Each structure stands twice: as structure tokens, then as C-alpha cells.
């Protein structure tokens, strides 16, 4: 059998009529319209919003707000500004041990980082785990040197 434009038909069940709910019992979806008997879910204006628990304090409000997340892989440093390095004399070596001796650092738990706040007027040999760009420039401008120590 060949099909022509005047003999084309849609597949059975593909063109289903929309159900008209609440238009009498004989229509098939009358009375309760498929919503069951009584209750909030059978009323008009449904559905309730997501997370609604019938007036009970919902779970998302009962659980405390999450605060103070610990940042994984966070790099913590014991920091010292250049202004504190003014206590050192000409061509002295500045490292964690010398900073602890001069009481500029107290029980350092983390690697040492030098920040660029302040001025350096003397030539120093600074040994630290990290330097800011400005700190490195200021130390080298004063004739000193910056040596990066390996992190352990």
C-alpha cells in the first residue's frame, strides 16, 4: 500500500484530547478531579511550595546556618612588615630565629612571609619563605638581598 498526502493518518494514541477536569461525573474527571478526598492537596491554589511542611518549622530553618568553613589547602604565614626590620643592624641576617630573638615573632607556627609596609634603610640579608613584590623591591633597593627558603 502506498501512502499519499490524502491518505496520511497520525498514529493511534498520538493525538489525545486534553482532559477537562471538574466538568461532571460522566466526563471521567468530575467531582474530586483525581485529587483524592479532602486535604490541602485537593484544594484550589495548590501545590504548596517546595520545603513546606504544613506550618511546622521546616528543616532548612531548623538546621543552623553553616559558618566558619575551614579553607582546605589554605596557606597560612607568620607575617612581618618591613617597618619591624628597622630594628636590625647593617648586613645582619634576618630569619625566623633572629626575629624570635628580637621578639618580633612569638612561637611561629607557619612559614615566614615579609610584607612591604614600611621602609628599610639598612642593607639586610633576609631569609623567608615568601615575600610580597613591594617588600622584595624595597629590600633590594636598600642594597639588601632576599633569599627564599624551602617550605617544609
Swiss-Prot record:
GO terms for biological process: translation. Residues 1-12 have a biased composition (Polar residues). Residues 14-23 have a biased composition (Basic residues). The keyword Nucleotide-binding does not apply. Residues 1-57 are annotated as: Disordered. It comes from the Bacteria. One of its GO terms (cellular component) is cytosolic large ribosomal subunit. One of its GO terms (molecular function) is rRNA binding. Keywords: Ribonucleoprotein, Ribosomal protein, RNA-binding, rRNA-binding. It holds the Pfam family Ribosomal_L27A. SUPFAM superfamilies: Ribosomal proteins L15p and L18e. The keyword Ribosomal protein applies. Residues 25-37 have a biased composition (Gly residues). Belongs to the universal ribosomal protein uL15 family. NCBIfam families: rplO_bact. Binds to the 23S rRNA. Part of the 50S ribosomal subunit. PANTHER family: 50S RIBOSOMAL PROTEIN L15, LARGE RIBOSOMAL SUBUNIT PROTEIN UL15M. This is Large ribosomal subunit protein uL15. It comes from Prochlorococcus marinus subsp. pastoris (strain CCMP1986 / NIES-2087 / MED4).
